[in-house]
């Protein structure tokens, strides 16, 4: 016999963090962070007669502009065993009660269920009234959350973790560590620096960025509960200079030894290689000397927001400077964040959405190339489902409004083009 339970926020979060289908987006502090963007939440829990919790759901609601209705979005929920049909149906019934009370035109869910083990769940959810929105590409704008993400297993020691990366990426990580960047956990006031980097990244890669209030809301709500950290990477000129000096001394010693060898092609080639190496190091020393003059205290090159819910870590947002990219700050940062997440109980590290194996001319190709070299596997989920409560409003909100918005964008583009011709 199933029944509703009255859980505290802590009890709800503990269940989410311990459940295999739990997710960051079902935590109560995540819901609180969404208040800034107009969402509010309600939640419920289901258990057995003994009072054991079997499932929970956090429901987000947002009012639809111009309509006296809301959308109910259970992001990465329900959190329960989907192979227990009675439990899922009971949870749907309660979700419908709450959704109708909030005048929702539909309930949208996108549970954290691997497609590989839950293909039958798609048919089951359709049989109880849900509409499956299809197995969309991971970068599709038709889904709120990406259906396909890249996830790395990180429950291993440092050596094994590094070894799990693709060969070329291992080399880049080692080089990044040697080149004098320092990765550290930053404080709330450093969000200003992060947002500046984010704007720079958005301009470079052609996407719109959020203002600082959004990131402050995330940090303020999730950080104190151990669900979020801000990381920054700083180039330390003095450390780089010291490292280059050691390298230069070694090259000069090797060059001196090579000069004393018997003449021959082998000697000539070795001297040539060492001379080229010495010249390159000399240029690097000059460059770092200039950097040191401009930034004597160091310069921030990149940053990221790392989130965690139980055994799952998430690379939420990343940003980097256009300057000094040859120091590979992102590679050093990712490695350190993976180690930090592991040391704090995470077993997996989610790099976020991708388009799987896109063609080279795809705008998503670079993202795929970056995310696939970290020992990651594609995590393919069952996708997004809608339960329609009020069909006319659903059709208007899900079809009519997007069509109107697209038409408005096209009209603005046309008017802009005509204006430019004058």
Regions found by a protein language model. Give the residues of each.
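Active-site/acyl-donor-binding loops of N-acyltransferases
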Residues: 6-9, 19, 32, 61, ...
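A conserved beta-strand-loop-helix scaffold within acyl/acetyltransferase catalytic domains
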Residues: 4-50, 54-67, 111-116, 130-144, ...
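Low-complexity, flexible helical/coil segments
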Residues: 4, 37-41, 92-94, 108-115, ...
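A general structural signal for short secondary-structure boundary/capping elements
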Residues: 104-105, 194-197, 229-231, 349-351, ...
């Amino acid at each position: 016999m199933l029944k509703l339970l009255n859980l505290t926020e802590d009890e709800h979060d503990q269940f989410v963090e311990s459940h295999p289908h739990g997710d960051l987006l079902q935590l109560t502090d995540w819901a609180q962070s969404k208040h800034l963007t107009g969402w509010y939440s309600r939640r419920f829990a289901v258990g057995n007669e003994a009072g054991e919790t079997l499932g929970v759901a956090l429901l987000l609601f947002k009012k639809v502009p111009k309509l006296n209705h809301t959308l109910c979005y259970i992001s990465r929920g329900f959190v329960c065993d989907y192979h227990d049909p009675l439990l899922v149906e009971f949870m749907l019934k309660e979700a419908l009660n709450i959704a109708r009370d909030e005048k929702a035109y539909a309930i949208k869910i996108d549970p954290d269920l691997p497609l590989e083990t839950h293909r039958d769940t798609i048919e089951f959810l359709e049989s109880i009234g849900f509409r499956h929105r299809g197995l969309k590409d991971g970068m599709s704008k038709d889904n709120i959350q990406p259906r396909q993400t890249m996830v790395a297993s990180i429950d291993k020691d440092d050596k094994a973790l590094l070894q799990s990366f693709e060969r070329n990426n291992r080399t880049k990580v080692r080089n990044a560590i040697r080149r004098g960047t320092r990765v550290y956990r930053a404080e709330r006031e450093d969000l200003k620096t992060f947002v500046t980097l984010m704007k720079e990244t958005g301009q470079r890669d052609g996407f719109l960025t959020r203002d600082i209030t959004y990131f402050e809301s995330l940090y303020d709500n999730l950080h104190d509960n151990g669900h979020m950290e801000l990381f920054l990477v700083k180039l330390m000129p003095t450390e780089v200079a010291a490292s280059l000096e050691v390298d230069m001394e070694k090259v000069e010693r090797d060059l001196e030894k090579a000069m004393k060898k018997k003449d021959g092609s082998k000697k000539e080639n070795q001297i040539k290689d060492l001379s080229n190496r010495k010249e390159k190091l000399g240029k690097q020393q000059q460059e770092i000397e200039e950097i040191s003059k401009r930034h004597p205290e160091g310069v921030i090159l990149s940053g990221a927001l790392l989130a965690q819910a139980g055994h799952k870590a998430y690379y939420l947002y990343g940003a980097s400077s256009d300057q000094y990219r040859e120091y590979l700050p992102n590679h050093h940062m990712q490695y350190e964040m993976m180690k930090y997440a592991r040391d704090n109980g995470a077993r997996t590290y989610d790099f976020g959405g991708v388009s799987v194996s896109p063609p080279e001319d795809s705008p998503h190709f670079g993202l795929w190339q970056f995310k696939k070299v970290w020992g990651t596997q594609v995590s393919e989920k069952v996708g997004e489902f809608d339960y329609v409560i009020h069909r006319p409003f659903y059709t208007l909100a899900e079809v009519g409004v997007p069509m109107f918005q697209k038409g408005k964008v096209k009209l603005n583009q046309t008017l802009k083009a005509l204006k430019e011709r004058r």
